[in-house]
């Protein structure tokens, strides 16, 4: 009899220990978001709406994709994200009826979401966490850790971050010793081909270009300025990277711009279409963007 009681007690203790170590949504979480507001969750978020493509990519990267019940219109990566309910574009009036119907326990917003939108969602009684855009790859890792904490995926995030850090280190090892840099014009938008938009100081694109071994000819101008055709001609970049290729801009079309036929990049065949999402979305695919830019600018270092 004593032996039966002993084994029953031991089994019960083991079961309790096992239950205690398993992921669970229980346990209050209190964090301060980037608007300085205390955000309280009853447990890890299980029904999440992402209001930005970068956040959607982070959620899936840390293993929380199955907890995403809504995404804004342009969240198209990873492909599985397209199976999540589309709540519409965030630059328009929010479809609050649809958002409420999804019964989210957490809505993640970023700098692409207007403060008025955050307030609108809060006024509906929804929990809204606001995240500033990171300014470095290292800060992006912090966003991954934050999202993992909110969703209960710390272990998966740690593994993903370690892999990303190793890839960045591999690029840094090859690029940092270089004493020279190739000049680059990165085109963001040529809706007005006479004054195309580019990325300047303080942008992810400039940060990644420089870390990949390039020099951005617009790095002394803040934000996303327009540059005249003459300004680009005067700078004569060694490379022109077409972040607007998906909108129909081609190496052939830019060669038709007045004066551009004599640019070094055009004459040397160094006008390259590029997937802008890899460098404009502050999420884990920034590392993909860094690798692709480094291979583009310094292919001889990445031949293996």
Label every model-predicted segment.
Residues 95-112, 126, 228-245:
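Proline-aspartate-enriched helix->loop->beta-strand connector
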